[in-house]
Amino acid sequence: MMKAIRSFSILLSLWFAAFACAQTSADPVDVYIHSEMQREHIPGLSLLVAREGRIVRAQGYGLANVELQVPVKPETIFQSGSVGKQFTATAVMMLVEEGKVKLDDSIKHYIKGAPAAWDQVTIRELLSHTAGFGDYPKNFNFRKDYTESDLLKIVEDIPLAYPPGTRWSYANLGYLTLGILIHQVTGKFYGDFLKERIFQPLGMSTTRIISEADIIPNRATGYRLVQGQLKNQEWVSPTLNTTADGALYFSVLDLAKWDAALYTEQVLKRASLDQMWSVTKLSNGEPNSGHYGFGWEIETRDGYRVIGHGGSWQGFRTHISRYVDDKLTVVVFANLESAETGRLTDHVAKMYLDAH
């Protein structure tokens, strides 16, 4: 392993040196990415730039697997982290359009036996992280296997952090619960619903629920830095790679298909998409402090309107930013849990925006 890590460091240094020497003629995006990969010790990275749903650049950098010296390609598959939440939110909005779910209904209408404390918790609040749900408890065992009922019981036993609708607080357990809602409303496991209703119709052939047991061509390995040393990701139980808070595989090529579909009504009606991309309001009428819609963050950066989301899971960091008015989308995936993919995404976007 140490030999592989040394080889990786040498290889990345050689790449950077080559680009530094030829900086006057090299592509400035390549120069920037290689420089940042060296600075952050990122093994591998995948980049997508798209305009109006058409690919401008889909490129891999570095290594998908350090030990086997496998390079990243546009086809390389990374784990989604919380970028997967936008697919959960889309699935819920599909059910809303079909009249099977109402945004302002209590979650108790859809999840049998939910506690009395959830009486006032609405689907809208779960989608926007304003329901009072929290994150996994500190003593949660990520290496234990759970049934869906086990996970729901854990969530139900955690008191609400605040009255629903009064505050914003990012809540993975809220999205986990939405995945269970999808299952109970449709009779289909969350991942199967996404495959049938989103991934297959859009031709997202490599996007699926995580399974470390299955043979997955082009799958990247996730890494972490421990006291400056590159280490493999820590493993979690198979159950926790199937939850709706962000447990997908995908490539930047599949995200390009997703991005293109968002310019159409192929997945959802325009009114539903606009609702997802609008900052929700608290019960006092004020916008939530997280600038959050349904599965998307909505921000203004340097005068540009941006909808996006980041993710982190099992040695991977991901980010998607869609510059709405400029019809520019930038996606960065990295196989290092500490990679600053959001910052990289913004910088690459600025390079393209400044060039036009």
Regions found by a protein language model. Name each.
Residues 1-10:
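Bacterial N-terminal signal peptides that target proteins for export
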Residues 9-18:
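Bacterial N-terminal signal peptides
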Residues 23-59, 183-196, 200, 226-356:
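Catalytic loop of the DD-peptidase/beta-lactamase superfamily, centered on the K-T-G motif
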Residues 41-81, 86, 99:
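N-terminal, post-signal-peptide region of Sec/Tat-exported proteins
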Residues 44, 74, 79-83, 95-138, ...:
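Active-site helix/loop module of the DD-peptidase/beta-lactamase fold
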Residues 68-72, 156-161, 233-241:
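Short glycine/proline-rich turn/loop motifs
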Residues 77-79, 110-114, 137-142, 163-167, ...:
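Second-shell loop/turn segments in exported
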Residues 82-83, 169-172:
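Catalytic nucleophile serine of serine hydrolases
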